């Protein structure tokens, strides 16, 4: 994530170049120029534990944080869609020394992603914001940048209302009825052999209902959604490139869900893996690195270009074999091979289907290709 953080900050320098005091603060923040090894904020404390509703809110002591929803949806006419909604918080003031009293600057930068896809099309949008455009509260819960919002409908955390609209695409969904689950050791999720870690919890079995607009046409939809919450000072080591992450909800609801990720080294080989098997009742079995392996079975060559990059051909995996202790081999395949978010920070985020030892559907995220 240090690699991603550095790229995000670079983008913000350009995006906010006319804004004060952001640029003044960024220019003073010399550690951010010292390379991808720079750690922002305090490492998460393994023994602190999670507390709710407090931890639904922001954690400014750690440098990177997100509120992340993915959903597999089916329309009344049988068409299927995927939706991603994410709010990222990035700390620029890693020593928490910001003294600016303006409501537009609190030492944090924010950006949000909204993506929506069919089996053949994928559309992604982004927004950047300063503190005056953002509201993050633990109770009643709200995570909002301008009019892109994830918020509790009442005092309790669930149900949630997800809203986003851009051009001819929108999502207005109600998300309800999922247990809260903690990954790793009661939420402390180790990411590397070197000990990088995050706090990580999820609502993996959300029932989604509402409407979406795709290319100007509105659909009534139902389906399954997954909410991830994570924060850290550094998720990966500077020698590592990124990760492949999967969330899977079983077709047979009684079988629960599965989360797995594998961190890749500088040669794009899988370096460190971890998984969680989640029962339908929300009981988690943490599965350690030695019991998880991932193998790419098929790739797709795609041309990538953003406003910040020149065109380049990149190979993305679109089919894998996941081996997890306790299951027969699991085959994972992308629903839409070109699920790239071609945004300021390009990455792949799209729906998957699984066969073999765990039959279901879900989402994959590929960062650092």
Give a label for each model feature.
Residues 20-369:
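Structured soluble/peripheral alpha/beta segments that form catalytic or ligand/cofactor-binding pockets
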Residues 1-8:
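Bacterial N-terminal signal peptides that target proteins for export
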